[in-house]
Design a protein with these regions (language model features):
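Alpha-helical transmembrane segments and their helix-helix packing motifs
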Residues: 1-327
Length: 327
């Protein structure tokens, strides 16, 4: 169960990383075409790197290089970056290997193809010449794997853990995208566009709002939209549902602290009064939600909740030092 949770979570993390890097790279090209000089490039990458949680000295070193490819290489391939795309795919693949009997041959095949794509791209100049094409391939493979998870394995307890990992990661990343939106400046059309595209929300947002690009509307949609698959509210409701599917507890009750905390988050999101909220109030809402999700993530595999068997060794970036195989 632990391995399935992290398998799904790492795939979701890679897709979100690729989308954020892709939209930021496109924005940097647009800025450089209109404003000559390196400062334009620095100004757009620094809040992104901060948002991704990299150490300040690493960020300073990357910005000082004044080279977008150095930043992208760090995000994509660096062995010093535990959350690089390459490391996340290696960890997803290793988690899949440990539960090989619980996933389909199609999932295993595409994970191997993904792993080989990343390995071959590491030393290939093509990705530097066309990062957009590289990120499109990464995003497409993540979406393919998500589809295979939904359509090629039993929808049993293991699948519920896969969905749990996906939705907790997705909710967290949407919150971080909104935090980045606040840091980058909400009133610039470029910032609004990249925020929606980073969350795969551009088309859905236009359909729901008929083209209103007010900052508070962006916050409200990505936080509270009840039927958009990447809104925080939707993800938390799904998280709550799948946790209850695992425990067998009725959805209107709870059997452990994880379900209690998840239910509380859902209640906050369901009953938040969006009509009387300005963007300042909505921004202040982000950090407490991130803290709540972090608490839930840490609680899921506590021994009194959904504990994994003691003999099962998880593979994730927070585990004790492990030798990464299949590099």
């Amino acid at each position: 169960s632990h391995n399935l949770f992290w398998l799904s979570r790492y795939i979701e993390r890679v897709e979100n990383l690729a989308r954020i890097a892709d939209t930021t790279f496109k924005d940097s090209i647009e800025i450089e075409s209109s404003v000559k000089g390196s400062k334009s490039n620095n100004s757009i990458w620094e809040p992104v790197l901060n948002n991704l949680g990299y150490p300040s000295d690493t960020i300073e070193s990357l910005i000082d290089e004044k080279d977008a490819n150095a930043i992208l290489s760090f995000i994509n391939f660096s062995s010093d970056n535990g959350d690089s795309i390459a490391n996340c795919i290696s960890q997803a693949r290793e988690n899949a290997r440990l539960v090989r009997d619980q996933i389909s041959e199609e999932i295993w095949r595409e994970l191997n193809r993904f792993h080989l794509l990343i390995r071959s791209s590491r030393n290939d100049e093509h990705w530097q010449q066309n990062p957009v094409d590289f990120y499109r391939k990464v995003i497409d493979l993540c979406m393919l794997l998500s589809g295979l998870i939904n359509s090629t394995i039993l929808h049993d307890e293991g699948w519920n853990f896969l969905q749990t990992g996906k939705h907790i990661e997705r909710a967290e990343k949407t919150l971080r995208i909104l935090t980045l939106f606040a840091d980058k400046g909400e009133n610039h059309s470029r910032s609004i566009n990249s925020t929606l595209r980073s969350a795969t929300a551009y088309s859905a947002y236009l359909s729901a709002t008929k083209g209103s690009f007010k900052p508070e509307s962006i916050y409200q949609f990505l936080l509270f939209a009840p039927s958009f698959p990447r809104s925080v509210r939707y993800c938390c409701r799904q998280l709550n549902y799948f946790l209850h599917q695992i425990s067998g507890c009725p959805i209107n009750s709870f059997s452990n602290p994880v379900e209690e905390n998840t239910r509380n988050i859902v209640a906050k999101l369901d009953f938040y009064n969006t009509q009387n909220s300005d963007k300042t109030q909505l921004k202040a809402y982000l950090e407490p939600l991130l803290e709540d999700l972090d608490t839930i993530s840490n609680q899921i595999f506590d021994e009194n909740n959904y504990a994994m068997p003691k003999f099962q060794k998880p593979w994730n970036s927070d585990s004790s030092q492990q030798t990464q195989s299949q590099q």
